[in-house]
């Protein structure tokens, strides 16, 4: 009790600088030469107060409660409280000008909107899962896409669970700390003046401090969602090479229509069905193929010759089958009064730089040895099977198609059919009608 009395008297009569207080005004210290026993006593009292403050942390809970009870029951306690109110009234003027409420953080609002749009925060109503399903439907709903988007939904659900678990921990820690501070301030309000409004202001400060943790959590969650989207739903991820069969079909159409490699909408739909791809993918493939062909014609000439020889062999087999079928069905040899016509499949507008079917040369770049051997074999098969004379080489079955000087495609005349002229009963010549 004596210690508490001496503490209150010291706080009421002495400030921290050692100046005496009288009527709320600090008096100048006496000259150094006139300091007496009172000055030494004040220094000793201040030293005792500082020592008690430093030993507060070493006190037990029972000792702290006992000193608190003694302070509240002391007769000078109301005087001490009034002095503290005066001090707070003077120092509180600078605090009143401070802004009471801060505007919401725009970055935090953007993070909240993104998490809500992705279905991570708020009630689970699809969110990113619905986006994944829409992307799967747009890509054709193949099994690979379905598996990928099911994995996306599973990963998104996992991110959502982790986010909500960490958010609950954050809210629990924030509430516990806020409750502790509020109880502490209410307890201290018995000794020093603390208004309820000041307690609310302190709660707001605590929440703003904790909001940095919340922003970090939401930022990391948004980054995880963006990485997940770039891995599963990015358009560049959807780009895959076509199958070998689809590439063969598209290349065959391209080189067989090299004079005008712009398929119609009906042709695109037909090619899309054959290749099991979409019409837009067919359009993109032809656009890219035309650009690559124009940039490097020499490189693609060998490929064009390969497809030319391949399709020529197919056409020769069809001609041979048609001739054999005609000989089987018509026992008499056609004379000058009768003529038969045979339609070659894809005979018109077929290949670039191919001068003749059984001629001696190709125009354009040098044909490889394997292609030349196929041409020689083809010429031999046609001569042996159909009895064609060398007159076939005199006429050009495949017209060369060139690019314009400005890079455009130049159309060439398209042969329509191959007919047998009326010369003799023992020979059949080819003739192209434009």
Swiss-Prot record:
Biased composition (Basic and acidic residues): 32-41
Tissues expressing the protein: Ubiquitously expressed.
CDD domains found in the cross-reference section: homeodomain
Main location: nucleus
PBC domain residues: 41-234
Bias (Polar residues): 403-422
PBC-A, as annotated region: 48-127
Any one GO molecular-function label of the UniProt entry: RNA polymerase II cis-regulatory region sequence-specific DNA binding
Family per similarity comment: Belongs to the TALE/PBX homeobox family.
Leader peptide range in chain numbering: none
Alphabetized Gene3D superfamilies for the sequence: Homeodomain-like
Compartments it resides in: Nucleus
Compositionally biased intervals (Low complexity): 326-341
Subunit structure: Interacts with PBXIP1.
Protein name: Pre-B-cell leukemia transcription factor 3
Purpose: Transcriptional activator that binds the sequence 5'-ATCAATCAA-3'.
InterPro entries, per database record: HD (IPR001356), Homeobox_CS (IPR017970), Homeodomain-like_sf (IPR009057), KN_HD (IPR008422), PBX_PBC_dom (IPR005542), TALE_homeobox (IPR050224)
Listed GO CC annotations: chromatin; nucleus; transcription regulator complex
Span list, region PBC-B: 130-234
DNA-binding region in chain numbering: 235-297
Positions of region (Disordered): 20-41, 326-349, 403-434
GO biological process, one term: respiratory gaseous exchange by respiratory system
Keywords: Activator, DNA-binding, Homeobox, Nucleus, Transcription, Transcription regulation
């Amino acid at each position: 009790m004596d210690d508490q009395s001496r503490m209150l008297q010291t706080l009421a009569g002495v400030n921290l600088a050692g100046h005496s207080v009288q009527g709320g005004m600090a008096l100048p210290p006496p000259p150094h030469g006139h300091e007496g026993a009172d000055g030494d006593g004040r220094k000793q009292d201040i030293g005792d107060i500082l020592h008690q403050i430093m030993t507060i942390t070493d006190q037990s809970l029972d000792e702290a409660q006992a000193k608190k009870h003694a302070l509240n029951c002391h007769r000078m306690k109301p005087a001490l409280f009034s002095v503290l109110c005066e001090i707070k009234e003077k120092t509180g003027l600078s605090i009143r000008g401070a802004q009471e409420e801060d505007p919401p953080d725009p970055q935090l609002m953007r993070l909240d909107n993104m998490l809500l749009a992705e279905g991570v925060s708020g009630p689970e109503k699809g969110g990113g899962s619905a986006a994944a399903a829409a992307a799967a439907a747009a890509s054709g709903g193949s099994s690979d896409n379905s598996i990928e988007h099911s994995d996306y939904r599973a990963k998104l659900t996992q991110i959502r669970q982790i986010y909500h678990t960490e958010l609950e921990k954050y809210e629990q820690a924030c509430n516990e700390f806020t409750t502790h501070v509020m109880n502490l301030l209410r307890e201290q309000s018995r000794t020093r003046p603390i208004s309820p409004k000041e307690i609310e202001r302190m709660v707001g400060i605590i929440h703003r401090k904790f909001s940095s943790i919340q922003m970090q959590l939401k930022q990391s969650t948004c980054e995880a969602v963006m990485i997940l989207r770039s891995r599963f739903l990015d358009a560049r991820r959807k780009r895959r090479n076509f199958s070998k069969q689809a590439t063969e079909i598209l290349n065959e159409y391209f080189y067989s229509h090299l004079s005008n490699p712009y398929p119609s909408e009906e042709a695109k739909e037909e090619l899309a069905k054959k290749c099991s791809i979409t019409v837009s993918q067919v359009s993109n493939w032809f656009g890219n193929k035309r650009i690559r062909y124009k940039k490097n014609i020499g490189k693609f000439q060998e490929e064009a010759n390969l497809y030319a020889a391949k399709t020529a062999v197919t056409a020769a087999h069809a001609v041979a089958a048609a001739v054999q079928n005609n000989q089987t069905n018509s026992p008499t040899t056609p004379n000058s009064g009768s003529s038969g016509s045979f339609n070659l499949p894809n005979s018109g507008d077929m290949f670039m730089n191919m001068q003749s079917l059984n001629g001696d040369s190709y125009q354009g770049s040098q044909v490889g040895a394997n292609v030349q051997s196929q041409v020689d074999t083809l010429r031999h098969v046609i001569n042996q099977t159909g009895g064609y004379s060398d007159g076939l080489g005199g006429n050009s079955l495949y017209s060369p198609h060139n690019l314009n000087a400005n890079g455009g495609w130049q159309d060439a005349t398209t042969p329509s059919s191959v007919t047998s002229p009326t010369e003799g009963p023992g020979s059949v010549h080819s003739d192209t009608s434009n």
